[in-house]
Amino acid sequence: MDKLREYLNLLKERFNALTPVQKALAVGIPLLLLSLGAVALIYLSQENYTVLYTGLSPDDLNAVVTELDKEGVKYKISPDGRTIYVPENVARELRLKLAAKGVPRKGIVGYELFDKSGIVLSRFQQLVNFKRAIEGELAKTIMSLDCVEFARVHIVLPEKSLFIREEEEAKASVFLKLKPGCELTPEQVKAIRNLVSGSVENLKPSQVVVVDDKGRDLTAYLDEEFKTNASQLKVKREFEKSLERKLQKTLEEVFGYGKVKVNVSAELDFSSMKKREELYDPDLTAVVSEQKKKERTTSTRAQGIPGTQANIPPATGRQGGGELITERKESITNYEVSKREIYFEDKTIKVKRISVGLVIDKDVKVNTEELKNLIIASAGLDPKRGDQVSIVSVPFVKPTVVAEKPKVPTYVYVAVALVSLVILGLVAFGLVKLLRRRPPAPTPAPAVPGVPPTVEEVRKKTPYEELLEIAKQEPEKVAMVLKKWLKEG
């Protein structure tokens, strides 16, 4: 104990001999490095959690938690009780194991309903179970789509009749809960409708209605009239957005970013025009048909006095009166005036009117008339057509921009921990060298002549070695003494 006090007093003298700056560095740097190393070690030892399942019903959540407890896996549950988190390194393996056990079922029962059916069931119970099984299997299939988070299918099966004329058609409705930011295309809606109709007997696609969680009838997208209206609305929005971007870019380059806000409303004419023209050119004629006819008639003239003598033919060798020859020519030519027919269909979208609304920050001083002329020229507006420009100057609300903290990679913490350990080692090495600088030992008394030094004197330990040995044997007392010195300053 006396040796411990002796060395502790020596250590205290060494510490008191240091300057205040050296004292602060000797105590603060090791503590700081130890703190950094501890923080880095704690962070690296923490497990990263990831989502195992989300959107779970209470029954499914209970089933998943039960299986996780059996596996001895740590988990966390979100405040709303619909999402469960597990360590990232075991998430994939757990999904495979739970899927093999049929967990979670999302509250939907399919053909596995018949696994628990009783021995004796009435015909009505069999029909109900069959309908529930089909509904469940269809819902599972629909939920395999990327955009569908939850699906529910309702089928109405009519009772079979002995008369074909009285037989009714089956009907079905599908409810979909879409994932945030997802929208089904008309092709996907049509595929869902065909899937349901193809899975149920006597169910036509036209008898299937698809509704989403926002109350919209998605089957309306398949109507031709709706497609036309939706297409026209899309063209209108694209036209308006194009003008907005053009004006917004031009004005922000002049007044600065965030100083103006542009809104454009356009009225477009989607009507098409069909035109048919017939042009006649009287100077250009063409022969359509031509017909020519020629007739020639030869007859003998009558001679002498009418009566018997006139009817008696002349004697042989006697030259009688002359012959009568008649010719007739007829020519018919049909002409037609040149005609040209033109068929023309104009499907060009026409702009009927454009209205531009501009909101500008009140801090910006502008000439309203010049700004209006700039907008008219930039957007190609025509006041004669009825185009309008409205400018309003109001103070803008300055949003509070919260800078997103960048995620520090793991290797940065590892590097900090290694550097901290290196610096801690260097500081410890410096302190050891500083403490080993003890004052010169007193001159020992001369040894008795002729008497050699003992082995204990030759192998006598240095004060630093003895101090380390005492600290190992009684660390608690050494710590108490160091704390006392720190308090004394």
UniProtKB/Swiss-Prot annotation:
It holds the Pfam family YscJ_FliF_C. GO terms for cellular component: bacterial-type flagellum basal body, MS ring; plasma membrane. Its main location: membrane. Residues 290-322 are annotated as: Disordered. GO terms for biological process: bacterial-type flagellum-dependent cell motility. Keywords: Bacterial flagellum, Cell inner membrane, Cell membrane, Membrane, Transmembrane, Transmembrane helix. It is found in: Cell inner membrane; Bacterial flagellum basal body. InterPro entries: AMP-bd_C_sf, Flag_M-ring_C, FlgMring_FliF, FliF_N_dom, YscJ/FliF. Residues 299-311 have a biased composition (Polar residues). GO terms for molecular function: cytoskeletal motor activity. The M ring may be actively involved in energy transduction. The basal body constitutes a major portion of the flagellar organelle and consists of five rings (E,L,P,S, and M) mounted on a central rod. The M ring is integral to the inner membrane of the cell and may be connected to the flagellar rod via the S ring. The S (supramembrane ring) lies just distal to the M ring. The L and P rings lie in the outer membrane and the periplasmic space, respectively. This is Flagellar M-ring protein. It comes from Aquifex aeolicus (strain VF5). The gene is fliF.
